[in-house]
Curated annotation (Swiss-Prot):
Family per similarity comment: Belongs to the HisA/HisF family.
GO BP terms: L-histidine biosynthetic process; L-tryptophan biosynthetic process
Name by which UniProt lists this protein: 1-(5-phosphoribosyl)-5-[(5-phosphoribosylamino)methylideneamino] imidazole-4-carboxamide isomerase
Translocase keyword on record: no
Protein's organism: Sinorhizobium medicae (strain WSM419)
One term of GO molecular function: 1-(5-phosphoribosyl)-5-[(5-phosphoribosylamino)methylideneamino]imidazole-4-carboxamide isomerase activity
HAMAP family: HisA
Transmembrane segments: none
Swiss-Prot/TrEMBL keywords: Amino-acid biosynthesis, Cytoplasm, Histidine biosynthesis, Isomerase
Top-level lineage group: Bacteria
UniProt pathway annotation: Amino-acid biosynthesis; L-histidine biosynthesis; L-histidine from 5-phospho-alpha-D-ribose 1-diphosphate: step 4/9
Catalytic activity from the UniProt record: 1-(5-phospho-beta-D-ribosyl)-5-[(5-phospho-beta-D-ribosylamino)methylideneamino]imidazole-4-carboxamide = 5-[(5-phospho-1-deoxy-D-ribulos-1-ylimino)methylamino]-1-(5-phospho-beta-D-ribosyl)imidazole-4-carboxamide
GO CC annotations on file: cytoplasm
């Protein structure tokens, strides 16, 4: 069970969006590497990074910022946004990423995801971003008719390390995680699920530690951390206590 702090990159800066709208970006830190170090010093064990410009462009745009993050932290880093080819995946893993997140390509070319899992075992996650229960692609700019569970089940047995499920309708507005949809997905597949979008308070962290949610790998937090709505120490203490209970 992991709480992943998020760094979303736009034009080289650490930002948060509301509902995935690039025009509603709030800059929280102009130095993403410093933010990565701060999260590590606060006790977080992983880092979730998204190249927002890259998600729209279909290729890496904020590569220099990601490289700076990788140099700044010893924590494992997972990256999504604009990664669409095997060469691109291999390049990023060689540069120090622990895990690559594939979103649009999981819809457009699922065979590539399966091949990536074979070639890079344990290093590939699938990002499923949903609006109204349907999968969105190309930086959330395009809607599909594909259902979340339908897409997730395509990768059963492929070796996907995790599914990162984001409810776009809740992203960045602090309304709480969509637990009904997240747990429905977690129950429908054997792949570990990471909840994203809307995490608002310690109540969401507590919910994540309840027995019904213990199939989850964890949750991603952005605005709630940046705005001080969640105290890192309190959140991490809750998770550590829950882990002890699971071990027992």
């Amino acid at each position: 069970m992991i709480l992943f702090p998020a760094i979303d990159l736009k034009d080289g800066q650490c930002v948060r969006l509301k509902l995935g709208d690039m025009e509603q970006a709030t800059v929280y830190n102009s130095d993403p590497a410093a933010q990565a170090r701060a999260f590590e010093e606060q006790g977080f064990e992983w880092l979730h990074v998204v190249d927002l410009n890259g998600a729209f462009a279909g290729e890496t745009v904020n590569g220099d910022a990601v490289d700076a993050i990788l140099r700044a932290t010893k924590n494992p880093v997972q990256l999504g946004g604009g990664i669409r080819t095997l060469d691109h995946i291999e390049n990023w893993l060689a540069r120090g990423l622990k895990r690559v997140i594939l979103g649009t390509v999981a819809v457009r070319d699922p065979a590539l995801v399966i091949e990536a899992c074979r070639k890079f075992p344990g290093r590939i996650a699938v990002g499923i971003d949903a609006k109204g229960g349907k999968v969105a692609v190309e930086g959330w700019a395009e809607a599909s008719e594909l259902g979340v569970i339908e897409l997730a089940r395509r990768f059963e047995g492929a070796g996907v390390a995790a599914i990162i499920y984001t409810d776009i309708d809740r992203d960045g507005i602090l309304t709480g995680i969509n637990w009904a949809a997240t747990l429905e997905l977690s129950d429908a597949v054997s792949i570990p699920v990471i909840a994203s979008g809307g995490l608002a308070s310690l109540d969401d962290i507590r919910r994540m530690t309840e027995p019904e949610a213990q199939k989850l790998e964890g949750a991603i937090s952005g605005r709630a951390l940046y705005d001080g709505r969640i105290d890192p120490k309190e959140a991490l203490d809750l998770i550590r206590e829950a882990r002890k209970g699971m071990i027992r």
